[in-house]
Every structure is written in C-alpha cells, then in structure tokens.
C-alpha cells in the first residue's frame, strides 16, 4: 500500500496539483465511481407505458395491472400501441380467469458484518460510513451503564464474518424463548456463504449482552449511540428468529384476448419482523376486495389509467452502495471501507449530495491519469487478487518479499514512464466569495489536513 501511495502521489502533485493522493484501494474506488458516471452520461432513455384497469366488485373499487395476452407478457413501447390495445379491450367483459392462493417466506437477516452495518446505518439512520465506525468504536470501547459500570456494548466492529459464539447463541436462544415464545425461535440458522475472501478472525457484530435491551440503555446513551446500538441489537436477535410468512392471493383477470394481474398479501406469521424491519422491507398493503374474489365474481369496468415512463440510468453510488460493490468485488477489507471513502471525499475527488456521490473535475483528472499510466493498479481484478495475496502473507503461506519482488519493478517502470509522457493537467482553483485585500480578486479555496 505504501509503495503505491508513496510512488504515485508525488506524480499527481507534479502533473495535476499539490495535496493529491493515490492508493491501491482508493484509486480503484474512484475508478468505480467514474465508470458509473460514464454509464449515466452515456445512457439513452427508452419510452414505455403501463396501464391499469379500475374495476368494481360489490361496489368496492380495485385496480388490476395490464400483463399481456394469452401467449404471454406484452411490453407497451408507445402510445399508439397502447391505444390499439384499449380499442380492442374497451367492449370486452372483465372476468376472473384464475386464482392462486399460497404463501411466501421472507428470510430472517444474518448478523451484521462491517460492510452490512455500514450499508444499513447509511440507509436507515443516514449515517456516513465514517460516522458509523466512529460510533461503533465508542460502543465497542465501553460506555457507562448504571449499575454495570463501563462496559463494551458490542463485539469488535471490523469483521467480515457472520459467525456467532456458542455462549452468545445460548444467551439469545434463552432471550427469544423467554420473551417471544418457542414459536419464534429459529430451528435452523442461516449464515453467510463461506468465501475464500472471508478472513473470519472475529465474530459477527452483535451485542455483548443481549439482555441489555435498547430500552434498558436508552436513557444512558447519546441519541446516535442509542440508534446504532438498537440497530445492531435488533438485527442480531432477529437473525435467530423464524422467517416471516406472507399469505398471498394472486388473480388473473381476462378481457378479450388480454390478461390483467392483481395480487395482495398479508402477514400470516410475523416471525423476526416482530422486532426488526430493515430499510429494504416491503410495505404490505392488503386489498381485501381482491382477496374476496372468486371465479364467479361479477366485475364492473370503471376506467383505464395510462402511465408513460422512461427507463432510468444507473443510480449514482451512495456510500452504502459503494461499500457493497467493493465487498462484492473483493476490494478492500472491513477496516478500509470507511477510510477509503473518507479519503476520496476529503481530497475533493467526489462530493456528496443527498447521499449520492458525484465525481468532481479533479476526481476525473486523477482517474484519467491512473487509467492511462497505471491501468493495472486500478483494475478491480488485480486489486482483489492482491487482497488474497496479502491474506496469504498474513497466514504465513507466502513470503512478503516475494510479492514485493514481483510487483515493485513493474510499478517503478510505470512511474518513470508516466513522468516522461504525461502532460500537466490544469485544474482551475475553486473561487470563494472572499475578496483579497491586496489585489482585489476573489480568493481561492485551498484544502489541507485541517
């Protein structure tokens, strides 16, 4: 990591401006952001339409969505096509063709790792990755609890494992059975799939004592500490509870040659959702009218509702989404996600607006230099492979000097080549509203460590 940073950062100072940095992980993260920006800029939206029919059953209105014809799904790509379909349907009788009742399972979550904690805290609490780690560190190091003294409320916060100790398993089992009953205790625990990239040096992030419920410590914790502890506590307890089960009701309604769909559901057994709903939980809205339909139901047509849409470009990365993408591609480690994002934001390579990360002109310039002169280093596959090699060094399987011998000569050549061939890039300084007393021009903003 030092080789990459110490070798390339001075080059960025020389070719762009002082105060910049490159790094084995941060430069790949920046490239991921720039690649997404390019996808967004190159995106060409396409038009499509959907259509609903508002029907009435026993004086109660409900909505069904256009699906297609008897052969299968039909995509509506323009208003002219939509109008033809409506013309063919308008005099048809709407009738129930098929009804399917069933159930659907929503699996209990697995305990937090560093990355999933950062992602969920970003989505649910609006915390940055750095704020999440700072508060988690406080909870880990210890807080004053009345009658208990200073105790660490959570386990170690830098981990990629979902493993839980036998002692904690026994404690949470006793808690769930005592507070919610045997029916809520999971009979089978699902853990994260094993991976060669998982180090498994530490347990999952969980409360050190599950009997210390969020309500018990709320009055003794600052607001942000309480909110994160509550998230961790609920996630862990929920991970040892049964799955939630939805009762589902799906109906196909025919109109001439065309088919409409309607569905509704309700929670049959709440399971883990009794205490925990994450930011991705769907909202269940039960439509009792749809649930009461049968094949003999007489339906009355009320109106069509037409909606024009355009396909959307890929979304900008949020901190949570970037952490997830880095983890999926094997870039970085639990200890590096937050510092990496903090660095590229602090260097003004990206800005953050309403959770979204946007690449700046400076970030694009740095990324272009890295892609042009150091394409190997900002390659995601190379970086992921290097993580594996470093793990092997830690495990004593490879001598660290061997990796250095294989890597450094190529890096040295790339730096020398870039020094000779790359042109200097001019990036305009960001002006402030302050006027210089000596020359009368606007002062420029300079970013430093403080």
State the predicted function of each range.
Residues 114-129, 323-334:
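Short helix-coil junctions and helix-kink-helix linkers
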Residues 42, 114, 125, 129, ...:
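RNA/tRNA-interacting regions in translation and RNA-turnover enzymes
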Residues 42, 78, 82, 100, ...:
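Basic, low-complexity terminal or inter-domain segments flanking catalytic cores
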Residues 16-21, 101-110, 122-125, 155-164, ...:
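Conserved short loop/turn motifs at secondary-structure junctions
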């Amino acid at each position: 990591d030092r080789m990459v940073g110490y070798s390339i950062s001075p080059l960025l100072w020389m070719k762009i401006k002082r105060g910049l940095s490159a790094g084995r992980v941060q430069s790949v993260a920046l490239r991921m952001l720039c690649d997404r920006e390019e996808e967004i800029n190159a995106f060409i939206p396409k038009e499509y339409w959907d259509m609903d029919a508002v029907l009435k059953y026993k004086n109660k209105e409900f909505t069904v969505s256009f699906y297609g014809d008897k052969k299968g799904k039909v995509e509506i790509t323009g208003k002219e096509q939509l109008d033809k379909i409506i013309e063919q349907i308008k005099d048809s009788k709407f009738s129930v063709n098929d009804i399917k009742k069933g159930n659907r399972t929503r699996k209990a979550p697995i305990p937090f790792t560093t990355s999933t904690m950062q992602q969920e805290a970003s989505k649910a609490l609006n915390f940055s990755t750095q704020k999440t780690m700072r508060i988690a560190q406080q909870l880990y190091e210890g807080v004053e609890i009345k009658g208990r003294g200073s105790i660490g409320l959570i386990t170690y916060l830098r981990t990629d494992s979902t493993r839980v100790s036998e002692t904690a398993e026994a404690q949470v089992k006793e808690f769930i059975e005592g507070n919610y009953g045997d029916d809520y205790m999971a009979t089978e625990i699902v853990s994260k799939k094993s991976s060669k990239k998982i180090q498994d040096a530490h347990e999952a992030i969980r409360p050190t004592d599950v009997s210390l419920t969020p309500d018990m410590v709320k009055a003794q914790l600052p607001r942000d500490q309480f909110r994160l502890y509550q998230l961790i506590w609920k996630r862990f307890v929920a991970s040892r509870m049964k799955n939630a089960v939805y009762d589902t009701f799906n109906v196909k309604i025919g109109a001439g040659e065309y088919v409409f769909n309607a569905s509704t559901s309700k929670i049959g057994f709440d399971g883990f959702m009794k205490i925990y709903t994450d930011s991705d939980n769907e909202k269940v809205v039960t439509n009792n009218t749809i649930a009461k339909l049968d094949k003999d139901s007489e339906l009355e047509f009320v109106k069509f509702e037409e909606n024009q849409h355009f396909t959307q470009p890929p979304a900008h990365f949020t901190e949570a989404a970037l952490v997830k993408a880095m983890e999926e591609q094997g870039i970085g480690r639990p200890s590096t996600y937050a510092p990496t994002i903090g660095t590229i934001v602090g260097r003004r390579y990206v800005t953050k607006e309403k959770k979204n990360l946007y690449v700046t002109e400076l970030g694009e310039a740095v990324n272009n230099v890295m892609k042009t002169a150091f394409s190997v280093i900002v390659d995601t596959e190379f970086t992921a492979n290097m993580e594996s090699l470093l793990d092997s060094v830690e495990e004593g399987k490879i001598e660290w000097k061997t990796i250095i011998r294989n890597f450094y000569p190529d890096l040295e050549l790339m730096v020398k080549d870039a020094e000779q061939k790359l042109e200097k890039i001019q990036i305009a300084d960001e002006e402030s509203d302050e006027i210089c007393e000596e020359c009368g021009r606007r002062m420029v903003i300079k970013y430093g460590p403080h």
